[in-house]
Amino acid sequence: MARQNNHYLGNPHVRGLDDVHDWTKEEILEFKKCKDSAVYFAENYCQVIHVDRGLVPFKLYDYQKEMYDHFDNNRFTIVLACRQSGKSISVVAYLLWYALFNTEKTVGILANKGDTAREMLSRITLMLENIPFFLQPGCKALNKGSIEFANNSRILSAATSGSSIRGKSLNIIYLDEFAFVENATEFYTSTYPVISSGRSTKVIITSTANGIGNMYHKLYEGAVQGTNEFKPFRVDWWDVPGRDEEWKKQTIANTSVLQFEQEFLNCLETNCQ
């Protein structure tokens, strides 16, 4: 067990820079398994807050595992997902894995509101605080807006304003709920030089549907038609375990057909069936 003065600013759950860890053979094997697979890392070492059960292990659904493979194998990913499908928390765990097991990488989390971006960073912090020290590279800085590790990788969070990432070299850019970002076209135009400046920079865009004509809709439709570099990934309501026709019927009864269509049908057309 690490000594108290080797914690980050007295936080007993975050490894400090001066911590010296004596590795066991089992830990070395586990580290390699985690480094080689985001799915293994997430399922075995990440914890999330469940609305009824509190802090619980993060068990990925099949479509979440497929999403990780999609991230690994594509530089540009755009995800269309129904409401409450776990898309954001899935990406959060993936970004933590990427920063922990790669050196000198910078991840940018951008959301339509600064509070939303910081909330996602707080989820990453919670995950970090619940993984063992041998998987943590040591922490240089941890605050509401960023985390920086001893391996010189860092995670930044910001609102999707035109100046939020200018001048920064990013290895992964994550845009959350992009269909709801105001002035999304202006933002994307100002962001694209950052994206295109590196040959390996990954872009992950996720959102629920928000009608047609917006920048998200344009990018997603272009991905489906193969006219841009993005590769589409879709999560429908029936992909989520526990959601069947009876669940659909009950949800509509408790809300309305219109609300169900808006929240769960992934409608990018004017008329949804």
Regions picked out by a protein language model, each given a short descriptive name:
Residues 2-273:
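Phosphate/NTP-binding elements of NTP-utilizing enzymes
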